[in-house]
Amino acid sequence: MQKSARSGREGDVLAVVDQSGPTVSFYDAADDRRLGSLDVLAEPHELCFDPVRRLLWCTVTYRSGFYHAHGGRRTELIVIDPDARRVVEVVDLAPEHAPHGLALDARRGRLYVTVEASADRPGGVVVIDAETRRPVGRIDTGAAGSHWVAVDAAGRTAYVANKEAPFVSALDLERGAVTARVEVPGSEGVAVSADGAYAFVAAPFSGSFAGGADGPAPGVRVVDTRTASVVATLPTEHRAVPLHLTSTGRLLVGEVRTEDGPAGGAVRMAPGRLTVFDAGTRERLGGVEVGRCPLTITSSPDGRLAYVACYASSTVHVVDLATLRSLARIDVAASGASGAHGLAYLPRAA
């Protein structure tokens, strides 16, 4: 008999950002029971777990709101001890601002954080020493709205999605420089294959999420990292925003869907979709409906479970990736219009 996708998860924890809370909450990965929460600075966005130092990093991007519609950019990273559920330190990156995307090279002890442009510098990636928790470098991306980042397994190259800019920045992390601009019609989530041969980019830029029939076709652009060029598109029905690659080679794509409001009113968020591709063959394997406005996706280390955080419905959806069946919905308490955002899966301590 095949084991349940939930089996063997005792002691594992899922951390979830409530952007409006503002909190980081912790859930038992075996049964989704809420274990507690931690109040943090407004407004937290993304999470990244460092398994070597057992620390959870959280970006604080805006004082309120979201990209291009906010109440001012923040400058902080929050460092959390997830086992004690306490804030260890607040790292201020000023004058850098709007930290958002996070990618960790745990072996080399480097954390990469996207930041937006200011009057005197373009957007970029700030390099943090994961041991000292201090900035040790900055790499310009050449774009204003650098927002998501993915690093290859070798820790040598990063790919940065730059929102409305018509390119993704390829960065040489050893030289600290841009090596290529990959042409795309704007970009959202980004991921890199395990062998580093391909990058995957959600495109086009989602803008207001309303889309348009005359715009570029939505989907995932497949980038040959050797030539820094798009070689294929994995089509989606609706705008693709978050991307995530599992340890088993599944490419998880969050599709944002909208609908007209009552009586022809303003466009509003409708239930979204998790679409799954085989990253190697590029075959579409299927999908499952999730909550409104999926913004972040992660998975369990064994690649059996997907977690989809949906901002507008303030829910996290747990999906069995073998059966593509929804197992549970976690309702994240939201104090405002926005809710669930950043996610991190925390395996139990050895």
Kindly give the residue locations of the regions a language model identified:
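Predominantly soluble domains enriched in secretory-pathway, periplasmic, or organellar proteins
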Residues: 1-350
